[in-house]
């Protein structure tokens, strides 16, 4: 379990997260919803260890506790943490002309027995991760020439390579933290990526937290929803329980209604 308890984050005297607690369970996809500036990326940064709880970090005051598999997050050294959790940040374009394959192989360095010494098996994992991300055709491409959506798929393959389970070895629960992974993707690739995330959460025993802006995507692909507003969780639970007009209005300040899609999966959320 990845736990955050009573998180308080403030920057320049302004509260960003206020007494927030959340649990990310292995084998479960949790979608984090909220309007712009609600604190979603800040929460993901604290859970990733980029904003350590218990003091000042990057100009922010962070208080509260974060534990990964029962161990305080701050007590886990960087190499081991990189094997236990992977982070896909919001889109950033590489400044150097790496190939897509080289970017994906970056996810394997935490597993190298010697610094910088990747193996043939690491190369095979990179190829399989590219295939899972629907990015095999991009393998040899210079990443500075890729579109936003193509680059997003390559970076998704990188975090898959980072958490790829070794054959025949028992693994502790691991965690995948995704910051708007579908933002640059077309409709088909949005659903393909989230389908893959949900399947791997079960097959690899991953706890997943993904920030998404479209509640309809969350309704179809998440096991749990957490809604964030003004730095606090205002609703959390199963999609059918949370994605209702009243909680959505509290989260977004926007009135909606639910329309039966006729497929028995989830209603469609549309403006009221």
From Swiss-Prot:
The gene is hmuV. It comes from Burkholderia pseudomallei (strain 1710b). Its EC number is 7.6.2.-. This is Hemin import ATP-binding protein HmuV. GO terms for cellular component: plasma membrane. It is found in: Cell inner membrane. InterPro entries: AAA+_ATPase, ABC_transporter-like_ATP-bd, ABC_transporter-like_CS, P-loop_NTPase. The complex is composed of two ATP-binding proteins (HmuV), two transmembrane proteins (HmuU) and a solute-binding protein (HmuT). Residues 2-255 form the ABC transporter domain. It holds the Pfam family ABC_tran. Coiled coil: none annotated. ATP binds at residues 34-41.
């Amino acid at each position: 379990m990845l736990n955050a308890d009573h998180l308080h984050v403030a920057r320049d005297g302004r509260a960003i997260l206020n007494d927030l607690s959340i649990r990310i369970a292995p084998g479960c996809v949790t979608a984090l919803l909220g309007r712009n500036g609600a604190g979603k990326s800040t929460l993901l940064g604290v859970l990733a260890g980029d904003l350590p709880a218990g003091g000042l970090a990057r100009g922010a005051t962070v208080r509260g506790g974060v534990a990964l598999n029962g161990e305080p997050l701050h007590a886990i050294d960087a190499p081991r943490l990189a094997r236990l959790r992977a982070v896909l940040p919001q889109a950033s374009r590489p400044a150097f002309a790496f190939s897509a394959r080289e970017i994906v192989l970056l996810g394997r360095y935490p597993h190298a027995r010697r610094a910088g010494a990747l193996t043939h098996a690491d190369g095979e994992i990179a190829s399989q991760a590219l295939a899972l991300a629907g990015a095999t055709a991009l393998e040899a491409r210079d990443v500075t020439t890729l579109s936003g959506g193509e680059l997003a798929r390559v970076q998704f393959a990188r975090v898959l390579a980072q958490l790829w389970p070794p054959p025949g070895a028992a693994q502790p629960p691991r965690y995948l933290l995704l910051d708007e992974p579908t933002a640059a993707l077309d409709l088909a690739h949005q659903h393909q990526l989230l389908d893959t995330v949900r399947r791997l959460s079960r097959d690899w025993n991953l706890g997943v937290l993904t920030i998404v802006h479209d509640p309809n995507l969350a309704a179809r692909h998440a096991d749990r929803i957490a809604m964030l507003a003004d730095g606090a969780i205002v609703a959390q639970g199963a999609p059918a329980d949370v994605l209702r007009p009243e909680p959505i209005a509290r989260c977004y300040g926007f009135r909606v209604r639910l329309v039966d899609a006729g497929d028995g999966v989830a209603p469609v959320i549309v403006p009221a």
